[in-house]
A protein has these predicted regions:
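Beta-propeller fold detector
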Residues: 51-53, 96-101, 136-144, 180-182, ...
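Short coil/turn segments that connect the beta-strands within blades of beta-propeller domains
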Residues: 69-70, 115-116, 157-158, 217-218, ...
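N-terminal, intrinsically disordered, polar/charged segments of Gram-positive cell-envelope systems
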Residues: 26-63
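Conserved Ser/Thr-centered positions that define the repeating blades of beta-propeller domains
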Residues: 88-89, 129-132, 232
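C-terminal motif of bacterial Sec signal peptides marking the signal peptidase cleavage site
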Residues: 18-21
Length: 324
């Protein structure tokens, strides 16, 4: 498929969660009073070691966010029980399970907004659910006749963007039949949930050259692969460009206009309000940066950075928590 869908679908893995403390000496605890309105100079280089804990019973994370009240919110599958959520109000020290009305549904490409709103795909449907509510189907009739949807991303509280087109079957180099979706007849549309078409923003170009999408509930931020610039898309289809980023190795996350991403040295915070960049974690030996491991989910709170790492060989997940 043409689009980089790094975050569109996460394969289920068993989960172990590692809590890692960094940026302080053993025995020290340095409270933070930072907010995410700007990148603080106190977010300095750091290294990490720590222990592992478990969340739930065979819980596999599909998506995560920081809720408006600062709580950590993960949605995923728990064994044969289907989808559920786990919430932490104490930066990951303890977790509370939250049942989801759509637990038994087949939903892929899950994305979360800071209010707990979920957007995803079910077959050729775009589905969504407010926190604690059942699934609803978005009206995508404005797209006309379609054969396939490859990705959906929330922009703000009223709009989302969707990519897809015609499905074609071909034989790959191993002699196996494989399907791909061409960027026709639509590509990168901004839609309202009632089916109104706002604009077509990608025009078949951004699909080749953009990825690492993350919404802060006001705009959808992403990386332009051609220039490696951070850009944003609003609900009216307006695109803004910011500065050039380092090479992204893992997942991304956005909160209050700050675009966080994983590179080959750790975690970087790019503040789009003033085009400044600060490294909040430096640790080239971090487990989520190693070969055969991929950082599939990244979230950043006022005090913690949490990276969900997937081991591509053993099909396990480990979550690493760092003080920042």
């Amino acid at each position: 498929m043409k689009r980089n869908l790094f975050l569109s679908a996460i394969l289920p893995f068993s989960l172990a969660v590692a809590l890692c403390a960094c940026g302080s000496t053993p025995g020290e605890s340095t409270p933070s009073e930072k907010t995410q309105s700007s990148v603080s100079q106190a977010q300095t280089d750091s290294a990490a070691t720590g222990n592992e804990i478990s969340i739930g019973n065979n819980f596999s994370i599909e998506a995560g966010t920081v809720l408006s009240d600062g709580s950590i919110y993960f949605v995923g599958r728990e064994g044969a029980d289907g989808f559920c959520a786990y919430v932490s109000t104490d930066d990951g020290d303890s977790w509370t399970k939250e049942e989801l009305p759509w637990a038994d549904q087949t939903v892929v490409g899950i994305k979360l907004r800071p209010d707990g709103f979920m957007l995803g795909m079910r077959g050729q449907q775009v589905v969504y659910a407010a926190r604690g509510e059942d699934l609803k189907t978005a009206d995508i009739s404005a797209l006309g006749a379609i054969d396939g949807i490859s990705a959906v991303y929330p922009i703000d509280g009223d709009t989302f963007t969707v990519t897809g087109g015609r499905t074609e079957t071909f034989v790959n180099e191993d002699g196996q039949e494989q399907e791909t979706i061409h960027p026709l007849p639509f590509e990168d549309m901004v839609l309202q949930y009632d089916g109104s078409l706002v604009t077509q923003w990608g025009e078949g170009i951004a699909a080749d050259q953009a990825g690492y999408y993350a919404s802060d509930e006001e705009k959808l931020y992403y990386v332009d692969f051609e220039t490696n610039e951070c850009r944003s898309l609003d609900g009216a289809g307006q695109i803004d460009s910011y500065g050039v980023l380092a090479t992204i190795k893992g997942s991304s996350f956005c909160r209050n206009g700050i675009f966080y991403y994983v590179d080959d040295q750790g975690i970087v915070a790019y503040d789009t309000t003033n085009n400044s960049e600060s490294r909040i974690l430096t640790d080239t030996l971090a487990p989520f940066l190693q070969d055969d491991v991929s950082c599939v989910t990244l979230i950043v709170t006022d005090h913690q950075a949490i990276a969900v790492a997937a081991d591509l060989n053993s099909e396990t997940q480990t979550v690493y928590r760092y003080e920042i």
